[in-house]
Amino acid sequence: MGGVCPKIKSIFRRNGDDFMIIVIDNYDSFTYNLVHYIGEFEQDIKVIRNDEMSVPEIMDNNPSKIVISPGPCTPKEAGISVELIKTAEVPILGVCLGHQAIGAAFGGNIIKAPEVFHGKTSSIDHDGSLLFSEIEKSYDVVRYHSLIIDMKTLPSELNVTATLSDDKEIIMAVEHINRPIYGVQFHPESIDTNNGTKLIENFIKKI
């Protein structure tokens, strides 16, 4: 959950091949931090606001992968994010609000977190999912959110791949059981998140 950045514009840079990443911007100030991290590994990026195009119009762009950004709202208010998760047949990474949208897309409840986190550093433990390849099993991440996916209503289609180190009931990452859909509650694009660049690299190069 970040602040609103109302004048973000779409960018589209071709690099001579057919690989292209679409970033769904949920009107968040962190979106272009995320784009910057993605740009370290793939320069062909298109940023589309969550109410700028329909899902069919987005898919007509033939994205290779989709990243759904953080945002200051709930999944229900995140434009086409939830519908896109349900229907797109390409790898998806959801960050913060994007992660919550994954939970909502498959029927999970999105509930208030035990406390509001704004720039808080927490330790997480992960299970070795491909998204966390070559990353130590416990490490520190930065969190900006007031909502979480409810562990008690976690959809059967999703596996938990990371939790807080000190509270295993707080979901920090999920993965779909048979589709390349991944969500992280924390902000890999924050400078104070360890291994954030590596996580983005894993999504782009290994998934």
Map each language-model feature to its residues:
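Acyltransferase
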Residues: 190-207
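A short beta-strand-loop structural module common to alpha/beta enzyme folds
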Residues: 44-52
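Short, charged N-terminal beta->alpha structural module
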Residues: 21-41
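Short, Lys/Arg-enriched N-terminal segments with co-localized hydrophobic residues
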Residues: 7-19
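Short amphipathic alpha-helix with an adjacent loop that forms part of the alpha/beta core around
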Residues: 54-62
